[in-house]
């Protein structure tokens, strides 16, 4: 899907009014916007900027990387451009699952999406993509590193749960179970949640039993680890559009045939395993893994991919909108909430061709449109 043209600020009006069919409840609603916040009570002198169609909270990309490029950190101007791309397609809340660039300065830009940061990836030497992670020489350093990233982030910490171990020639866990338990307990004591990159099978039991809050990707889920996720209340962000990179990763791994075969097997089973988790009741949310190899602005494609695991169009949109906001502790179209919402002339559940092109974006009470 091509990136949409950048949409421009349309208005800085202090008082706005929108009217239409609100999602998720599919009821007629009217909202007034005053000083960047929603009011459910009428406000005199408001300018009606949308009348008819569908109104919903801003979309959520629950797994992206603002400030990350193919080789690691990027200049702040590039990070801003990445965030603008997300805003243009309606993704107004981003969970940044690890970035080497300090993007805290973006919080001062009222025209950019809100970012929930997870600090930097935590990994072992040569056990993740070069330039992306803080690499710990000894796994015993993990609890202290988690505490540091919890302070750096916005309530999340990101671990690399598995990666290729070149000594054995296949995917393998990075951390022992007791270290994981201590690290995740440390994060929880600081009020932070923890998530982990996991492609394969072996790293999952230790992470889930240690109390991790979320699994990213999860292509190696088994019936047993799905049951563990249900027992522990672990969420899943499968980044399904990233699954399409697995064959290319395998093709490039000629020196490691076992690893290549494993990646192809995970690709073949990935949708089925995520579907099984969803059917069992594991909470599933939409994230694109944008940054590095995945272009920003593809949340509509991920919503479409979620329908391939059995979600209805309404459920898939919820996984990238109202349900994801609830999971992340952020409001929707609530009275006094920040006015971060989207307006569509057509039903956005029709598909990515509609969802990716909101007719009106309202962010912090400012309007943006084609």
From Swiss-Prot:
CDD domains: Met_dep_hydrolase_A. It comes from the Bacteria. It holds the Pfam family Amidohydro_1. One of its GO terms (molecular function) is hydrolase activity, acting on carbon-nitrogen (but not peptide) bonds. Belongs to the metallo-dependent hydrolases superfamily. This is Uncharacterized protein Mb2939c. It comes from Mycobacterium bovis (strain ATCC BAA-935 / AF2122/97).
């Amino acid at each position: 899907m091509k990136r949409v043209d950048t949409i421009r600020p349309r208005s800085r009006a202090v008082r706005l009014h929108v009217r239409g069919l609100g999602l998720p409840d599919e009821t007629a609603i009217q909202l007034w916007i005053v000083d960047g916040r929603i009011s459910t009570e009428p406000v005199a002198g408001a300018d009606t900027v949308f009348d008819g169609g569908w109104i919903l909270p801003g979309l959520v990309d629950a797994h992206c990387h603002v400030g990350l490029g193919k080789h690691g950190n990027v200049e702040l101007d590039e990070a801003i451009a990445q965030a603008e791309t997300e805003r243009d397609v309606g993704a107004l809340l981003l969970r940044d699952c690890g970035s080497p660039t300090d993007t805290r300065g973006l919080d001062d830009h009222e025209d950019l999406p809100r970012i929930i940061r997870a600090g930097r990836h935590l990994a072992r030497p040569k056990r993740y993509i070069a330039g992306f992670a803080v690499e710990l020489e000894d796994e015993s350093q993990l609890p202290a590193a988690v505490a540091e990233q919890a302070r750096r982030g916005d309530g999340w910490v990101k671990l690399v749960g598995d990666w290729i171990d070149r000594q054995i020639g296949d995917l393998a866990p990075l951390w022992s179970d007791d270290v994981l338990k201590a690290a995740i307990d440390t994060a929880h004591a600081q009020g932070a949640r923890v998530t982990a990159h996991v492609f394969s099978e072996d790293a999952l039991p230790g992470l889930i039993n240690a109390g991790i809050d979320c699994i990213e990707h999860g292509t190696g889920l088994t019936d047993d680890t799905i049951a563990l996720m249900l027992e522990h209340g672990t969420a899943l962000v499968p980044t399904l559009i990233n699954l399409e990179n697995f064959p290319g990763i395998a093709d490039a791994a000629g020196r490691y045939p076992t690893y290549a075969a494993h990646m192809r097997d995970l690709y073949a089973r990935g949708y089925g395993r995520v579907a099984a988790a969803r059917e069992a009741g594991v909470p599933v949310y939409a994230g694109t893994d944008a940054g590095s190899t995945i272009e920003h602005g593809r949340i509509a494609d991920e919503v479409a991919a979620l329908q391939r695991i059995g979600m209805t169009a309404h459920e898939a949109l919820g996984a990238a909108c109202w349900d994801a906001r609830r999971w992340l502790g952020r409001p929707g179209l609530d009275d006094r909430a920040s006015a971060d919402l989207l307006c569509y002339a057509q039903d956005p559940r029709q598909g990515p061709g509609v969802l990716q092109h909101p007719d009106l974006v309202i962010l912090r009470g400012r309007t943006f449109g084609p």
